[in-house]
Curated annotation (Swiss-Prot):
It is an enzyme of class 4 (lyase). SMART domains: DHDPS. It comes from Idiomarina loihiensis (strain ATCC BAA-735 / DSM 15497 / L2-TR). Catalyzes the condensation of (S)-aspartate-beta-semialdehyde [(S)-ASA] and pyruvate to 4-hydroxy-tetrahydrodipicolinate (HTPA). HAMAP family: DapA (MF_00418). One of its GO terms (molecular function) is 4-hydroxy-tetrahydrodipicolinate synthase activity. Belongs to the DapA family. It is found in: Cytoplasm. The lineage of its organism: Bacteria, Pseudomonadati, Pseudomonadota, Gammaproteobacteria, Alteromonadales. This is 4-hydroxy-tetrahydrodipicolinate synthase.
Amino acid sequence: MLKGSIVALVTPFTKYGNVDYSELEFLVNKHCEAGTDAIVAVGTTGESTTLTHEEHIAVVNAMVELSAGRIDIIAGNGSNSTSEAVQLTEKMTQAGVSGFLNVTPYYNKPSLAGLIAHYQACADATDKPQILYNVPGRTSLDMTPDMVEQLAKIDNVIGIKEATGDVSRVQELKERCGDDFILLSGDDPTAREFMFAGGHGVISVTANIVPAKMKELVTAALAGDKESANQIDAELAPLHNMLFVESNPIPVKWSLALMGWVSANYRLPLTPPEESNQQLIESVLQKANLLNIQES
């Protein structure tokens, strides 16, 4: 299912900097048990920019195998080089992923014509659906609703992860792209309002640490149960805010380490949180009763 409660999963590393496949298996099992609808593998939260292409493909292959059909795996296939994005797409299609999350090419700021050509090339490389990913805070390119309308004409482009936090875009995207075009929030603090406005789910960082609770929030919001959704989101708000006190995925990986789920290992240029933020993260987790819950 490429909608609902989708986790943007971290990529765990050993102290030597290698991918920790044992911890990865633990995380995949956690999300299957919690009812998470899909996992995004090797996206922004998965530190995709510090993995080699070989590692990127290996992690996706492992997730498909570990999931064993229990949960959909959506692979990050974005790059600011179209040829590299196409190569990743071809390899991960062979792995058996359910679809792709394809971020706008970053740094080189292509025109609309360049974007169309880029996404068409990726579409030609697979028979799997693609979800566009708009995160201008990282890419310096805002994929506006009028641009999305043009990209949605590509056959296997079925939706967008909209990470601007601008809930007003939901209605405009629906009007331009139709009700069947999947709209996913990419911003945890505004995801509830995004779904109230007509969105179809969220690709969530917070779901890494509270997968079952995020599933409850999404289920309530999509069902129109505003009272329950508001109550759940109020409980989650301190977590939403804490997870972005530094660049994602620094706080979420530190949180998972304090919970006993993964080791607190990053790849440069990412480093552990500043000491003051380490204390903040621990305090928020303690108040939420999330410290040292490895077997819960």
